[in-house]
């Protein structure tokens, strides 16, 4: 697959366009349909798994971003890229990200590595090699998982794309004027899920307070943090930011971020944030947007070829 530097189409001349175009207009037909499996977690909730199998002994596990799922174009594009290179693929939905709301009060968040652990443990028995890919929130989740687990079973390499390594920095950055539309879209979806969760568990939080918040930071402070055992948003961000786990990673891991990613801050885009791990490489491209790297001609996007090449090297 192509190994040259990423050059965006001339019409997609900035990070906003490189983010928005693939999110709205990229259409993906899977090379083979997903096969759905639902697994039960140790706490008696469920996770939905979506497989693409071809009797390979190499498996790629894909973790999606905030308010995403296995049907997002960036997930399916990455799935096709690896399936075409003889990998089996497993994409999964976090708690609350399927058509059916999950059973327990807890939902998903950037540090919920117990669920990624459950997915890896469920899949690993059939594969000699497992590779992890995470996008955005899923990138943070993947990196935190690796830092917690060290060298784990058959997990060989990982790739974290559009990784918000400092959650507080990323959250506050969404509350800037240029990111108003992104934050509004996220909040509309998050509030809808929170209302459904409140219908299940009316004592979980104050519904009136939910209707009065408008930022990701406030949502994390009111909903995400207390529901998942954190004191407040600051506590959640400090305990779950991937930057605090990178030096403990024990397998080859590639972080791929774009300098023009509208979701990432100069703090996140400073390579010093990655520390001095012998196992973590941090590549920053000048172009790409957030979970983007689009083109108009090739079926495989640059970031997808990048991940395939990294795993095969």
Locations of regions flagged by a protein language model:
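Short amphipathic alpha-helix adjacent to the substrate-entry channel of hydrolases
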Residues: 73-91, 274
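Catalytic histidine-centered segment of alpha/beta-hydrolase-like enzymes
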Residues: 288-302
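Short beta-strand/loop motif that positions the catalytic acidic residue
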Residues: 249, 255-257, 261
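Catalytic nucleophile-loop/oxyanion-hole region of alpha/beta-hydrolase
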Residues: 81, 95-131
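N-terminal cap/lid segment of alpha/beta-hydrolase-fold proteins
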Residues: 14-54, 294-298
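Alpha/beta-hydrolase-fold enzymes
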Residues: 126, 131-226
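Short beta-strand element of the alpha/beta-hydrolase
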Residues: 57-65
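Catalytic histidine neighborhood in serine/cysteine hydrolases
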Residues: 275-291
């Amino acid at each position: 697959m192509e190994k040259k530097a990423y050059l965006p189409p001339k019409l997609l001349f900035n990070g906003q366009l490189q983010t928005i175009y693939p999110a709205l207009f990229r259409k993906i037909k899977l090379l083979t349909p997903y096969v759905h499996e639902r697994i039960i977690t140790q706490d008696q909730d469920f996770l939905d798994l979506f497989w693409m199998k071809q009797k390979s002994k190499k498996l790629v596990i894909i973790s999606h971003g905030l308010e995403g799922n296995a049907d997002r174009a960036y997930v399916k594009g990455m799935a096709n890229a690896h399936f075409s290179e003889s990998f089996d693929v497993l994409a999964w939905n976090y708690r609350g990200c399927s058509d059916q709301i999950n059973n327990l009060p807890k939902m998903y968040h950037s540090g919920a590595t117990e669920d990624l652990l459950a997915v890896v443990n469920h899949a690993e028995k059939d594969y000699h090699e497992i590779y992890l890919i995470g996008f955005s929130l899923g990138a943070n989740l993947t990196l935190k998982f690796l830092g917690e687990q060290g060298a784990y079973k058959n997990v060989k390499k990982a790739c974290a794309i559009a990784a918000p390594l400092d959650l507080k920095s990323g959250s506050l950055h969404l509350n800037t004027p240029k990111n108003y539309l992104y934050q509004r879209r996220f909040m509309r979806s998050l509030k809808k899920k929170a209302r459904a969760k409140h219908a299940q568990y009316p004592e979980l939080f104050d519904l009136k307070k939910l209707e009065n918040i408008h930022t990701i930071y406030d949502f994390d402070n009111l909903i995400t943090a207390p529901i998942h055992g954190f004191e407040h948003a600051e506590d959640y961000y400090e305990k779950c930011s991937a930057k605090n786990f990178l030096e403990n990673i024990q397998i080859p891991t590639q972080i791929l971020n774009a300098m023009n990613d509208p979701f990432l801050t100069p703090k996140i885009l400073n390579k010093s944030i990655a520390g001095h791990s012998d196992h973590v490489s941090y590549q920053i491209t000048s172009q790409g947007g957030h979970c983007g790297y689009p083109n108009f001609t090739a079926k495989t996007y640059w970031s997808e070829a990048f991940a395939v090449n990294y795993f095969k090297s």
